[in-house]
Amino acid sequence: FYNFQSEYDALIEVINADYEVRGGSSNIPSKEEFETVSNRTTLVQIQAGGTGIELQYNNLVVFFSPTWSYQDYEQALGRAYRNGQDKKVTVFKFVTKDTIEEDVYEALTSKKDFTKDMFLKRLGG
């Protein structure tokens, strides 16, 4: 999962994505193909991948950057943890030490949005 176009541009240079979900478009396998799909990479823009798609053919989830919205975060995770997922799901989060990303993931883990007030507190204001 990624947030920004610049992330997508960087990722697509190093990852051979088999499927994509971004903006208003997606190319993902049909439900009938889920059983035969393995070792495939799907790049998903967090906001685009939140609702209405099923990604349970994936059991490895990587967040390249966090969203500030708990709802978007939970929806994104829910794409892999769907009915029909028969494999253990592993989630990785890229977090740069001593950055705001640590605070964002702390809020998300506490089931909260990362807010402007939290951001200002991080800045010492």
Positions of predicted regions on the chain:
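A short beta-strand element within the Helicase C-terminal
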Residues: 53-66, 89-93
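Short, well-ordered beta-strand core segments
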Residues: 42, 61-62, 80
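A conserved SF2-helicase RecA2
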Residues: 68-125
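Active-site-adjacent loop/helix micro-motif of nuclease/hydrolase catalytic cores
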Residues: 28-32, 53, 68-74
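Residues at the C-termini of beta-strands that transition into short coil/loop
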Residues: 22-25, 65, 95
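Conserved helicase ATPase core of P-loop NTP-dependent helicases/translocases
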Residues: 9-12, 16-49
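Short amphipathic alpha-helical segments
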Residues: 11-13, 53-58, 74-75, 105-106
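Conserved RecA-like ASCE P-loop NTPase motor core of nucleic-acid helicases/translocases
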Residues: 1-4
